């Protein structure tokens, strides 16, 4: 495994990777738009993370647990039948899957949950809170809290609880208390708002394990850095598998943690295209989508400035996606920055396109991806016809689809 601490040493000499600024900004995005009562906790967290990365004992423990508990490194798998499906005379691309679905708990989320739990212990916090949409971050957080004997409270929207009943049971089985959020749209945005309110009230004893590269600084940086192991492994595995860096990286984007984990170690590699895929829901020209980068404008949500879905009066609009994990009206500030400087590209696919992709990948590869991940797979329909010969594509297979079986069963005629 690539040592996490080496990544921080390398970052010092690279303008792209030397983000965020000391003020927690990615260009104009990011920052700390929070009540004064939270500022000491954010400063404490930033210092704890900075000190931890310099502490060999912390890094060694993290890497040991990633290997023996999480099951890293995850494979880079050549999807041969999916490759054959998209090959034509003009497109001879190969498709590779970074198998984050094979992690303990079934998704990439545990990379960050584990790292932040170790930080919480380092700071002397015994109570952990988290938000969750699809339930995967909630399960990952409940899992690491069980591992370390920490009290765990998970906030989840009532609508998402209906869609993800299996993950709700898993969280409870792991000893977590699941608090139902009924305000607003009763989805991820509202669960996040409730978690922040809890943190404001209990900041002395509680650490908030935020699940995406969103929120106030230093969360976007911390979550990114714990997930960067995805891209670090992929970079090494690509060289081993086909002798070079990939041509294209592809990942779904809601808040954006799995994509940033894959993208970050490649940002300075200008030959590698970075493509994020958002949820178009019923279509980006309807009022039922979650395509924040595609259709959003600059605003402030959950303590950070970024692109978000809002009306002409600056009120945050409802997001919609068949995927609970992409059903969020904001996006991480670093994604907004990468889009602005032209380093990353972003597109969107509809619910129907994602469902069709999930079915296709399941039938061709024997891998049932999460609905979130299926959005990245669906982009192949638009991407592959535009490519030159011998293009190497790496898709972040960010999670498995067990949690989505009920939703898929009610939507697909199988």
Curated annotation (Swiss-Prot):
Region Disordered, residue ranges: 1-23
EC annotation from Swiss-Prot or TrEMBL: 4.2.1.20
InterPro entries xref list: Trp_synth_b_CS (IPR006653), Trp_synth_beta (IPR006654), Trp_synth_beta/beta-like (IPR023026), TrpB-like_PALP (IPR001926), TrpB-like_PALP_sf (IPR036052)
Biased composition (Basic and acidic residues): 1-12
Pathway: Amino-acid biosynthesis; L-tryptophan biosynthesis; L-tryptophan from chorismate: step 5/5
Sorted UniProt keywords: Amino-acid biosynthesis, Aromatic amino acid biosynthesis, Lyase, Pyridoxal phosphate, Tryptophan biosynthesis
Record CDD domains: Trp-synth_B
Pfam families: PALP
Residues that bear N6-(pyridoxal phosphate)lysine: 109
Single GO MF annotation: tryptophan synthase activity
Subunit structure of this chain's protein: Tetramer of two alpha and two beta chains.
Role summary: The beta subunit is responsible for the synthesis of L-tryptophan from indole and L-serine.
Name of the molecule in the record: Tryptophan synthase beta chain
Native species: Prochlorococcus marinus (strain MIT 9515)
Gene this chain is encoded by: trpB
């Amino acid at each position: 495994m690539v040592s996490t601490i080496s990544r921080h040493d390398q970052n010092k000499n690279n303008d792209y990777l030397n983000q965020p600024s000391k003020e927690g900004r990615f260009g104009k995005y990011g920052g700390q738009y929070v009540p004064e009562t939270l500022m000491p906790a954010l400063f404490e967290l930033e210092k704890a993370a900075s000190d931890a990365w310099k502490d060999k004992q912390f890094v060694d423990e993290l890497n040991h647990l990633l290997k023996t508990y999480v099951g890293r490194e995850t494979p880079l798998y050549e999807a041969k039948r999916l490759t054959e499906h998209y090959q034509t005379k003009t497109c001879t691309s190969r498709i590779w899957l970074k198998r984050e679905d094979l992690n303990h708990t079934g998704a990439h989320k545990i990379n960050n949950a584990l790292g932040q739990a170790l930080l919480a212990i380092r700071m002397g916090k015994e109570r952990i809170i988290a938000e969750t949409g699809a339930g995967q971050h909630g399960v990952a957080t409940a899992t690491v809290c069980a591992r370390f004997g920490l009290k765990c409270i998970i906030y989840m929207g009532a609508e998402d609880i209906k869609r993800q009943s299996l993950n709700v049971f898993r969280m409870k089985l792991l000893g977590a208390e699941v608090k139902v959020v009924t305000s607003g749209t009763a989805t991820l945005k509202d669960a996040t708002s409730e978690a922040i309110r809890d943190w404001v009230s209990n900041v002395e004893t509680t650490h908030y394990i935020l699940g995406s590269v969103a929120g106030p600084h230093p969360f976007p940086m911390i979550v990114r850095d714990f997930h960067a192991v995805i891209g670090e492994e992929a970079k090494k595995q690509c060289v081993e598998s086909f002798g070079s860096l990939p041509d294209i990286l592809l990942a779904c984007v809601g808040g954006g943690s799995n994509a940033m984990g894959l993208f970050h170690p490649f940002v300075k590699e200008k030959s590698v295209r970075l493509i994020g895929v958002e949820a178009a829901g019923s279509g980006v020209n309807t009022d039922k989508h979650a395509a924040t980068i595609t259709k959003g404008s600059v605003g402030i949500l959950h303590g950070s400035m970024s692109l978000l879905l809002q009306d002409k009066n600056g009120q945050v609009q409802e997001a919609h996606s068949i995927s609970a994990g992409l059903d969020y009206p904001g996006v991480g500030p670093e994604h907004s920055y990468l889009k602005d400087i032209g380093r990353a590209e972003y597109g969107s696919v509809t619910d129907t396109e994602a469902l069709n992709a999930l079915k296709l990948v399941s039938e061709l590869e024997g891998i049932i991806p999460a609905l979130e991940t299926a959005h990245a797979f669906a982009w192949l329909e638009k991407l592959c016809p535009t490519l030159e010969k011998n293009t190497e594509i790496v898709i972040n297979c960010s999670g498995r689809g067990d949690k989505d079986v009920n939703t898929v069963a009610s939507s697909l005629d199988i």
